[in-house]
């Protein structure tokens, strides 16, 4: 079982395919995504990797977290997330994960915090049909109606669909397709919409309900030192570059 990634939702656009079709996609950016820590069976009782992404203002990082990053010799991160992995899929601390972690055409599960809508009625929140426009209905046209209980059991069951706070909840959209990856810019293009607002953080994992394609980077697609280091231009003859 491989690790997932942390990505920032940049926004939506469209891509034109070779056959002329246009596909709506969500652009996700891997912002300096690194392995911050490992969790091992011997020490923690389970195996996982802790990833970090983004660059925070140092004054917003607590003293405890600064010590955590310093102990691992990793730059402070704005967003942290932990992914359960198998023992053979542990990644070295400090390794930077590339956008090529996923393959084109692969199915993934994307999790994020949905956009908050505030207090919403039953028609908007649960797609209820509402009551009749007339014939005995007064000022209750958009109400949810009866909650379904009488003297026995004499209460409303937990989980009953009613008006309440809508959105701002953890949502996972499954089996979304990876249309394209751009390792140079650290971008992953996902077909369709993903949960959350622009600039929101999401996690992307291999789809649990689909078979993983062959050729997946294992344990992860890690940027090499040669890729990270910029190539210096050779100085011109007889002078500096």
Swiss-Prot record:
This is Large ribosomal subunit protein uL3. GO terms for cellular component: cytosolic large ribosomal subunit. The lineage of its organism: Bacteria, Pseudomonadati, Pseudomonadota, Alphaproteobacteria, Rhodobacterales. Methylated by PrmB. It comes from Ruegeria pomeroyi (strain ATCC 700808 / DSM 15171 / DSS-3). One of its GO terms (molecular function) is rRNA binding. The modification N5-methylglutamine is found at residue 151. Part of the 50S ribosomal subunit. Forms a cluster with proteins L14 and L19. It holds the Pfam family Ribosomal_L3. One of its GO terms (biological process) is translation. InterPro entries: Ribosomal_uL3, Ribosomal_uL3_bac/org-type, Ribosomal_uL3_CS, Transl_B-barrel_sf. Keywords: Methylation, Ribonucleoprotein, Ribosomal protein, RNA-binding, rRNA-binding. One of the primary rRNA binding proteins, it binds directly near the 3'-end of the 23S rRNA, where it nucleates assembly of the 50S subunit. It comes from the Bacteria. Belongs to the universal ribosomal protein uL3 family.
């Amino acid at each position: 079982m491989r690790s997932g990634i942390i990505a920032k939702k940049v926004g939506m656009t469209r891509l034109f395919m070779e056959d002329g079709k246009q596909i709506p996609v969500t652009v996700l950016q891997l912002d300096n995504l690194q392995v911050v820590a490992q969790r091992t069976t011997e020490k923690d009782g389970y195996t996982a990797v802790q990833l970090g992404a983004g660059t925070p203002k140092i004054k917003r990082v607590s003293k405890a977290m600064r010590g955590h990053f310093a102990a691992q010799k990793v730059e402070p991160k704005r967003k942290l997330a932990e992914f359960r992995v198998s023992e053979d899929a542990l990644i070295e601390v400090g390794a930077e994960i590339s956008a090529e972690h996923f393959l084109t055409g692969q199915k993934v599960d994307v999790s994020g915090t949905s956009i908050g809508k505030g207090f919403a009625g039953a028609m908007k929140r649960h797609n209820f049909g509402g009551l009749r426009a007339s014939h005995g209905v007064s000022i209750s046209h958009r109400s949810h109606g009866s909650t379904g209980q009488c003297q026995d059991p004499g209460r409303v069951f937990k989980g009953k669909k009613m008006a309440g706070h809508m959105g701002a909840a953890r949502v996972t959209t499954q089996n979304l397709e990876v249309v394209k990856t751009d390792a140079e810019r650290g971008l992953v293009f996902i077909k369709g919409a993903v949960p959350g607002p622009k600039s929101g953080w999401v996690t992307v994992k291999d789809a649990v309900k689909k078979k993983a394609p062959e050729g997946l980077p294992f344990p992860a697609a890690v940027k090499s030192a040669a890729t990270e280091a910029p190539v210096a231009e050779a100085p011109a003859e007889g002078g500096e570059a």
